[in-house]
């Protein structure tokens, strides 16, 4: 049985999923990116299964090489965008922690909560 057309189609689907994930990361659609990750992992597993059954010919490997490069480039870009997002989130968590510490230390003075008033006079 010739698996070449099915293998090529599986790789094309992986390219499509990879491009979708890059677009979602670029557009900062983080929830959608996470939701699409399982389909990407499943596509990778399908390719692994197909290549375990029958190793692709040298000709097929040459045809698949540009797809693999594109997938790896997309994955690298997604990782960079995710790192930027993680740094942003770490900064926000740090700011929140500082605010909580300040409120804890200075927010309750003598039983009264300090809050700005509209009219002081």
Swiss-Prot record:
Region (FliD binding): 60-98
Subcellular location: Cytoplasm, Cytosol
GO biological process, one term: bacterial-type flagellum organization
One Pfam family cited in the UniProt record for this chain: FliT
Residue ranges of the region described as Required for homodimerization: 1-50
UniProtKB keywords: Bacterial flagellum biogenesis, Chaperone, Cytoplasm, Repressor, Transcription, Transcription regulation
GO cellular component: cytosol
Superkingdom of source: Bacteria
Entry-linked Gene3D superfamilies: Flagellar protein flit (1.20.58.380)
Function: Dual-function protein that regulates the transcription of class 2 flagellar operons and that also acts as an export chaperone for the filament-capping protein FliD. As a transcriptional regulator, acts as an anti-FlhDC factor; it directly binds FlhC, thus inhibiting the binding of the FlhC/FlhD complex to class 2 promoters, resulting in decreased expression of class 2 flagellar operons. As a chaperone, effects FliD transition to the membrane by preventing its premature polymerization, and by directing it to the export apparatus.
Subunit structure, as described in the record: Homodimer. Interacts with FliD and FlhC.
Family to which this protein belongs: Belongs to the FliT family.
Descriptive protein name: Flagellar protein FliT
Gene: fliT
């Amino acid at each position: 049985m010739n698996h070449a057309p099915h293998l090529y189609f599986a790789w094309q689907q992986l390219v499509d999923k990879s491009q979708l994930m890059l677009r979602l990361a670029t557009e900062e659609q983080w929830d959608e990116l996470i939701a699409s990750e399982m389909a990407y992992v499943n596509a990778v597993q399908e390719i692994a299964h197909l290549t375990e059954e029958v190793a692709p010919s040298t000709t097929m490997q040459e045809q698949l090489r540009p797809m693999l490069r594109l997938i790896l480039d997309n994955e690298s870009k997604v990782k960079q965008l995710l790192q930027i997002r993680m740094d942003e989130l770490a900064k926000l968590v740090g700011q929140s922690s500082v605010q909580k510490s300040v409120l804890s230390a200075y927010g309750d003075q003598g039983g009264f909560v300090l809050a700005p008033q509209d009219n002081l006079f």
